[in-house]
């Protein structure tokens, strides 16, 4: 591997002797250098470099004997002052090389450092994996193409645990343990576990470690399906469902404020398990989505204060966040920054590092913060927790994913991590301002007025440090969410949620014309811009420190171009050529016609209201049997596949859900009711009316019948239904 370069501006007065590549300061990519050599006129560069918080060694070259300049520069961090005397070039060159090498040695995280060293050792391999550093692949043209595409190091780093030098990933020893210990420190956890097959598995590990059959589970109705699988189906927990909000745009909101009241929770317990209703701490585990897919993030401190005394543990599923503790204004949103005592619940946080942090796909981590209850009966020891970890983990881990988790922690260490996210937040603010300024059919989900000024008139730096600019104020009409309390929820500044026209948000009604977001999403994809997801009248873009101003400008430019095409009402083939090519139906369509037809369909079905009712207690399907029992009936073959049109009143054996977002609408063991049936029948009708815009649906099966897609679901055969 090549050593890092040196950035310099002092070439003329200090010709350093080095084998490293020298790069002009004005052309420098600072993450790729190990030292910077400057002159006394470069004081502005010192400030810029220090603002990155990389702790790069900075060497300032001054004239020999210039004590004033020496004193001026010595006050800066990581700065070394040398003179330009020719007689000292060799000495200073060695000093600079020493500083550069020392910097290189400390930038790598524990496991990644060990992995690099191991792959360079050129061992003769007679173990797994069978490709043995890529050599097997190289025996065939197809394999060589594969290796050439990914690069040799990836294959050399794909190792077997037959050699224990890197530590055992399942029992947490050696460099593997060092990496998890380091991550725990960075993320303010007592213990951290790296998970290599996604947060679906992380959630199952946590729930398998904590939940036993019959335990009460306070269950956010927004929870990902993996929480149902782990806590309710595998663990056998008894769910107490908490209703959640949706706004007319289709955005996923948080749990209603009333659901966190002790009286409300104890009444739920009386309905399901009255013998536990008066226990001091009746809830074994609460499972709460810290941030929804659509960027509504909770006040974690408030949640812990309200329900903590009722719960042994709270699991914050933070798949869609995890970076909040590195954004100072979001401190109240981080469960890992809350001060905890012996009467508080144990805190578990699961994070999908691959979503918006720096990780390969499937990289996830579990943060365990429960030392404050160590010694109490409710405490889950490492041995018990790790038993669940090993039950859900492969004995053949992919080391590069583990290394990525390790490196992610290093990136977030100290001020550097906070700096990266601060810049991301500022760019997100600028993106929203750009949309407000340039677009007429799109607007960001932000308060219209903050501190008596229009949102977009705020100072970006101030806005990036003031959560008021992202507050979902209780009772405010502009966001459309109901049931929120004071400072209970905020907009995630790192999720750019754009709303499309078509909704009168003050009245929560459909207007005469609207732009369904699915059309915009398809248009952007056809123009090489990939949004994360969309629903009825909103489209979501994830923001990370990877973003650039150029990317944002390109996005806004394409949105403006879409508006231009819409105003001209051009033929659809000019907007969505791939769609028209694949589906004859749209051959003579113009863009406004397609927008109008889908909008009218939404309006005629009032699908936003149907979606909202899916998650309200009043309209939840009847709980007939536990999800675990329903799944057992499914395994025993006691289910039957029937048309969805006949499902009303029947007991579901599978969770049914659109994907994304992976939130179950009908849980196993619940009885299909009118609202749930109508919602999925709407999806069935939309699939038939608007080919090319089909959503992915799980737990509902589609079969062709008389040229149309017909929806089916698996329900319990009537002869096996519980007797009333």
Language model segments and positions:
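Mature N-terminal, pre-catalytic/accessory segment of carbohydrate-active enzymes
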Residues: 1-4
